[in-house]
Amino acid sequence: MVAAFACAMGVGFFVAPLASAHQPVNLNERDRTPAQGPLLVDGTVSFAVNADLSRGDKRGFRFQLEKNDTLAVQLLIVDQKPANQLRPSQLPRITVTDPNGKVIRMKFNERTNFFEPYSGTNYLYLSRLNERGVQGTYKVRMTGRDSTPVKTVIAVGYREVRGEVRN
């Protein structure tokens, strides 16, 4: 009986981190630029930055990386009509500017389904960045390009631990 409990606890120990969810951060109309938006103090901690974007809407936020950290950013939208039927030119434009000023435009190079069990929400992955990061503060800009509101999520980081957000 004790061995079975220890085995179950061991399995639970290894499975629990896989079931963790990104910490939500919701952007609103006050977060029009990265400087006005929140700062994710550690960009390796997993966050889900949410914004509803229509034509002309602008949102921004920042995150920091240290030396040798991995830059991990994913662009998702909620998989619902009519937003999931928009052409790439109608979807929100997302740019990531590194601390050296290099601008990366997230290109729509996939439409991979993802079911998030905690909220019961279906998403579509549209783009992912995964590369060696540069030490310093990154700036993310989000711009709506269609009259259809698009529930947009920028997932940052990969470590499922509690993180700090500064406004």
Regions found by a protein language model. Give the residues of each.
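Contiguous segments within soluble domain cores/interaction surfaces
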Residues: P24-L27, L75-F115
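Beta-sandwich interaction modules
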Residues: F114-G133
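C-terminal edge strands of extracellular/lumenal beta-sandwich accessory domains
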Residues: H22-T33, F61, S89-G101, L129-N167
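Bacterial N-terminal signal peptides
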Residues: A3-F14
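Hydrophobic beta-strand segments within beta-rich accessory/binding domains
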Residues: G60-Q85, Y138-R145
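Non-catalytic extracellular/lumenal accessory regions of secreted precursors
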Residues: L18-R59, F108-N109, R159-N167
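Solvent-exposed loop and beta-edge segments used for protein-protein assembly and interaction
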Residues: R55-D57, L65-K67, L86-P88, Y118, ...
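Residues that act as N-cap/strand-start positions at coil-to-secondary-structure junctions
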Residues: V45, R55-D57, P88-Q90, L124-Y125
